[in-house]
């Protein structure tokens, strides 16, 4: 449901609705402190909870996947360079200090505007998300 009336007032036709309703989602199982989590990211998503509950893990994974998606679209990185030699975990997740959070039972499904990333059985699969149009190049800010 769309609740931002200022945005609604600026919509000229139904095709403008698409970019507002498209939603980025993140499903996480057995990663760090998270046993199971499903998050739908809206224009502004705020995490509030106890220390050690996994808020930072979610924020770091979201930041990582949006960065990867943007890099793939701009051709600054390739799908092969991300999935080869388990670089997703060993390089990109390690950059966010998440490498030790993964186990053989870890599962992540990130559905972005242009790409779907699925991490399962210690392997990352990347595929195009054909259901969406242009990328909304959002700014991501992680504040611990």
Located regions from the model:
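P-loop NTPase switch/coupling surface
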Residues: 1-144
């Amino acid at each position: 449901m769309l609740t931002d009336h200022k945005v609604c007032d600026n919509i000229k036709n139904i095709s403008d609705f698409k970019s507002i309703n498209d939603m980025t989602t993140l499903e996480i199982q057995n990663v760090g402190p998270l046993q199971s989590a499903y998050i739908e990211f809206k224009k502004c998503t705020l995490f509030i909870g106890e220390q050690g509950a996994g808020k930072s893990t979610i924020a770091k994974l979201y930041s990582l996947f949006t960065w990867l998606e943007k890099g793939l679209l701009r051709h600054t990185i390739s799908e092969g360079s991300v999935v080869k030699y388990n670089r997703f975990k060993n390089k990109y997740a390690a950059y966010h200090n998440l490498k030790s959070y993964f186990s053989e039972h870890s599962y992540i499904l990130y559905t972005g505007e242009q790409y779907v990333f699925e991490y399962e059985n210690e392997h990352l699969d990347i595929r195009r998300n054909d259901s969406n149009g242009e990328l909304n190049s959002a700014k991501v800010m992680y504040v611990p």
